């Protein structure tokens, strides 16, 4: 029997894997640091009540000096306020873009300082996840020795997860990576013509779509920390009526720490939906989810709305496209919409996206038979 369509699988795990993986998110598209923050949130979600801070995370940010504000600053502030005992942050570098011809002694010194912190953290055994944010361009610029970094990562403690982000990942790093997702930007001239802003789409077969969306949710929460009532987030999920999905721990962590800010709804059967095995309940559940989303978009109550797995829902023809287009065209200007999920045929609302990243899967450890790990994969 031929099966056409897209199914959303729950995470399957036979036992807790003992070997931590090396993740690389690169490419020129948006979503790399956001995806890393999503993984951080998953790990923290499982570590809230864990003994001995066993899910502690280090977020080490290269090329991001303290003199400038970055997109993810609000997200990190939300993490540190909600889970101060589970996350450490170190920032290095100067707060401006520079090319190879503009490298200074300070740049090399700051890269070395950051790498010294990284080596100590990796060897310490204190962390379950170490994020090396923007280490890829640091290596590409020659500020650190690729061979030294690769050698250290290859000899890391067995259970430690490493996440490396940024453009220009060197081939030697990609060779040892267990997961490699590349963010490729796609541009939609119609969105520019219509002056559309605040619609982001993450699609493709690579890992990092829903996690990027969760990073955006964290950013929204962080922006509203000092302005109670100014920020509210809705996470609306389709095709996810069961449990054990990759982002469950992350959403649970958000709702536990920010219950008055985060709303979460999901719809669908606890089953994989194929095009040739759709049931009446699939249509009913998809429409139920859209009614919730449509009202939320029009209300102006939410500043960030995540429409998780809307793309495959439309691709499976469980929802019509035109009502979605019209709702997005009429959204409040200060409402951000993040839409996720792979699809075979791009629906018309893609033309309204001001940011669209195709997450391309070069390598994924799950395809090599590696068991999934709670707090990283789900």
Swiss-Prot record:
One of its GO terms (molecular function) is corrinoid adenosyltransferase activity. GO terms for biological process: cobalamin biosynthetic process. InterPro entries: CblAdoTrfase_CobA, P-loop_NTPase. This is Uncharacterized protein all2391. The lineage of its organism: Bacteria, Bacillati, Cyanobacteriota, Cyanophyceae, Nostocales.
């Amino acid at each position: 029997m031929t099966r056409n369509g897209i199914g959303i699988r729950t995470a399957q795990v036979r036992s807790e894997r003992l070997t931590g993986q090396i993740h690389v998110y690169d490419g020129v598209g948006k979503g790399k640091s956001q995806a890393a923050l999503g993984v951080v949130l998953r790990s923290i979600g499982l570590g809230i009540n864990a003994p001995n801070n066993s899910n502690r995370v280090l977020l080490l940010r290269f090329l991001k000096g303290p003199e400038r504000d970055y997109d993810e600053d609000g997200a990190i502030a939300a993490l540190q306020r909600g889970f101060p005992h589970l996350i450490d942050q170190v920032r290095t570098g100067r707060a401006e873009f520079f090319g190879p011809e503009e490298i200074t002694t300070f740049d090399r010194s700051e890269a070395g300082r950051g790498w010294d912190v990284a080596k100590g953290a990796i060897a310490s055994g204190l962390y379950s996840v170490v994020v090396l944010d923007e280490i890829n361009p640091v290596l590409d610029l020659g500020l650190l020795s690729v061979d030294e970094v690769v050698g250290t990562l290859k000899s890391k403690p067995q259970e430690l997860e490493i996440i490396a982000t940024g453009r220009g990942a060197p081939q030697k790093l990609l060779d040892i990576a267990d997961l490699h997702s590349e963010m490729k930007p796609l541009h939609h001239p119609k969105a520019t013509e219509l002056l559309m802003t605040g619609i982001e789409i993450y699609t493709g077969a690579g890992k990092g779509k829903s996690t990027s969306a969760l990073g955006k949710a964290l950013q929204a929460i962080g922006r509203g920390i000092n302005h109670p009532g100014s920020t509210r987030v809705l996470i609306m999920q389709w095709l996810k009526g069961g449990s054990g999905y990759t982002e469950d721990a992350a959403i649970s962590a958000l709702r536990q720490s920010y219950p008055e800010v985060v709303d979460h709804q999901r719809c669908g059967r606890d089953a994989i939906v194929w095009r040739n095995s759709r049931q009446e309940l699939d249509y009913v559940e998809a429409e139920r989810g859209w009614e919730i989303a449509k009202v939320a978009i029009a209300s102006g109550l939410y500043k960030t709305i995540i429409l998780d797995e809307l793309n495959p829902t439309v691709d499976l023809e469980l929802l019509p496209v035109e009502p979605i287009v019209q709702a997005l065209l009429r959204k409040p200007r200060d409402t951000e919409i993040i839409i996720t999920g792979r699809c075979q045929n791009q629906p018309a609302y893609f033309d309204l996206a001001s940011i669209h990243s195709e997450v391309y899967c070069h390598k994924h450890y799950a395809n090599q038979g590696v068991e999934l790990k709670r707090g990283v994969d789900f």
